[in-house]
């Protein structure tokens, strides 16, 4: 009997021959088939997975590196096994032979391409309600969104359909679904992970990211992706200095989210963490100047460049015409036909607002001698599928996209690393995540801090799949 657990624990069991790789894969396949209603996957190849598992067992390699571990790759990432459709009809036949850099590193270490994760169409959205491929459902409550755009990966990891996964994060798309699904999501410093072989949104902001059961799994996968052994940084909570920029990040939270944040802060304070309540000057102003101007201007340009250079048999205009999700089509067509964001606005975002946003973060960390910043990943918990444009938040109707990405957006625009950790359940049993952000290129230390916080919180809740 195989009990599914984390990647690190699974590798240990495989090395100790507690079960074979084939037995592990059979257990995972059965679980995936039983949970097909979550619509987490666009493509699987169980025959190939079984064959590969048998070969690994025959050669006695199970548990060495990542050998035997199936991962879910978001459908905009080339794996060499599945089509890199980015969840849009126009790319349904796009199947690159060469895996993306981030996939190549993991597959070379022995990981198996377990599934292609369903996603928000072309990554431009946070609900994963894809009108072309169907909505991904949250394993905690199938009537709710899992977050996005890497919703399929997060749902698969939370439901233990796959042991871990790789998504992409432009402004929220790894950390938000991780938070709404009760798992760990890591967005590295921009440039830490390779971005080749990935259908893009905004090259300035895009990065692959890891979704996993726990922080040790993230540390393991991060080291493999970066091509170096994980750095053994042991961090004691006592003496850590963590910033609380309350005016922006703690404003207008759902009551359950606010309570969870207060509880976690008290737990860590009892561990002698020093909290510094101070705001980042002009954060909202600088972030607003970067966020949408950069993403909206770069989206059609980067997508067209990718299609022209890496996709055969279909043109950019054909891909655009085939888009099914109204929210994605409206944004893309508005930029293409009406020049929603002008070149001058884009240049202002890149040359003025983004450097000032980055400088504001740098000065904030330095002035207060901070190790990290702590805040709720999202101001609210998962909401019903279908509320793509507006959602009720604290009694008022608000823009769905803007409220869900509000807290995770600024550090994305600054290119900083962020780690979302599951910390609590709401009164109606939905996961709540807290994020820690670090300064640029502090990824290893941020992960070490996350590990220490994870151990202090000891979140053990899992969804029950029907």
UniProtKB/Swiss-Prot annotation:
<keyword id="KW-0073">Auxin biosynthesis</keyword>
<dbReference type="GO" id="GO:0009851">
    <property type="term" value="P:auxin biosynthetic process"/>
</dbReference>
<keyword id="KW-0614">Plasmid</keyword>
<dbReference type="Pfam" id="PF01425">
    <property type="entry name" value="Amidase"/>
</dbReference>
<feature type="active site" description="Charge relay system">
    <location>
        <position position="74"/>
    </location>
</feature>
<protein>
    <recommendedName>
        <fullName>Indoleacetamide hydrolase</fullName>
        <ecNumber>3.5.1.-</ecNumber>
    </recommendedName>
</protein>
<feature type="active site" description="Acyl-ester intermediate">
    <location>
        <position position="173"/>
    </location>
</feature>
<comment type="pathway">
    <text>Plant hormone metabolism; auxin biosynthesis.</text>
</comment>
<dbReference type="InterPro" id="IPR036928">
    <property type="entry name" value="AS_sf"/>
</dbReference>
<comment type="similarity">
    <text>Belongs to the amidase family.</text>
</comment>
<keyword id="KW-0378">Hydrolase</keyword>
<comment type="function">
    <text>Hydrolyzes indole-3-acetamide (IAM) into indole-3-acetic acid (IAA).</text>
</comment>
<dbReference type="InterPro" id="IPR020556">
    <property type="entry name" value="Amidase_CS"/>
</dbReference>
<feature type="active site" description="Charge relay system">
    <location>
        <position position="149"/>
    </location>
</feature>
<dbReference type="InterPro" id="IPR023631">
    <property type="entry name" value="Amidase_dom"/>
</dbReference>
<dbReference type="InterPro" id="IPR000120">
    <property type="entry name" value="Amidase"/>
</dbReference>
<dbReference type="GO" id="GO:0016787">
    <property type="term" value="F:hydrolase activity"/>
</dbReference>
């Amino acid at each position: 009997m195989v009990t599914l657990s984390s990647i690190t624990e699974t590798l240990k069991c495989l090395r100790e021959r507690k079960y074979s790789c084939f037995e592990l894969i059979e257990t995972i396949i059965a679980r995936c088939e039983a949970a097909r209603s979550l619509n987490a996957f666009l493509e699987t190849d169980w025959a190939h997975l079984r064959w590969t598992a048998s070969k690994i067992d025959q050669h006695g390699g199970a548990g060495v590196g990542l050998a035997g571990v199936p991962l879910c790759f978001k459908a905009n990432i080339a794996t060499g096994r599945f089509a890199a459709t980015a969840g849009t009809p126009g790319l349904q036949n796009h199947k690159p032979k060469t895996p993306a850099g981030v996939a190549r590193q993991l597959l070379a270490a022995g990981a198996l391409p377990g599934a292609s994760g369903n996603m928000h169409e072309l990554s431009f959205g946070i609900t994963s309600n894809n009108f072309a491929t169907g909505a991904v459902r949250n394993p905690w409550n199938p009537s709710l969104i899992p977050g996005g755009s890497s919703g399929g990966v997060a749902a698969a990891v939370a439901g233990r359909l796959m042991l871990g996964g790789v998504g992409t994060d432009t402004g929220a798309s790894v950390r938000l679904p991780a938070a709404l699904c009760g798992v760990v999501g890591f967005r590295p410093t921009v440039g830490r992970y390779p971005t080749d072989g990935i259908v893009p949104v905004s090259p300035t902001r895009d990065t692959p990211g890891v979704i996993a059961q726990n922080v040790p799994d993230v540390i393991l996968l991060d080291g493999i992706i970066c091509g170096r052994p994980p750095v053994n940084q042991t961090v004691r909570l006592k003496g850590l200095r963590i910033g609380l920029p309350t005016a922006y990040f703690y404003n207008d939270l759902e009551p359950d989210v606010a309570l969870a944040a207060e509880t976690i802060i008290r737990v860590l304070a009892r561990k002698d963490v020093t909290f510094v309540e101070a705001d980042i000057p002009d954060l909202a102003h600088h972030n607003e100047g970067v966020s949408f101007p950069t993403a909206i201007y770069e989206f059609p340009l980067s997508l067209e460049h990718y299609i022209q250079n890496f996709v055969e048999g279909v043109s950019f205009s054909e891909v655009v015409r085939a888009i099914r999700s109204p929210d994605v089509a409206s944004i893309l067509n508005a930029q293409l036909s009406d020049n929603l964001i002008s070149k001058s606005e884009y240049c202002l975002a890149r040359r003025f607002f983004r450097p000032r946003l980055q400088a504001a973060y740098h000065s904030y960390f330095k002035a207060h001698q901070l190790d990290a910043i702590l805040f709720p990943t999202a101001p609210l918990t998962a909401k019903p599928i279908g509320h793509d444009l507006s959602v009720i938040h604290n009694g008022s109707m608000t823009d769905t996209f803007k409220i869900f990405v509000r807290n995770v957006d600024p550090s994305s625009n600054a290119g900083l690393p962020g780690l979302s950790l599951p910390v609590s359940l709401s009164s109606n049993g939905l996961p709540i995540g807290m994020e820690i952000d670090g300064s640029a290129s502090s990824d290893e230390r941020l992960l070490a801090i996350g590990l220490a916080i994870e151990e202090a919180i000891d979140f053990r809740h899992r969804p029950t799949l029907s």
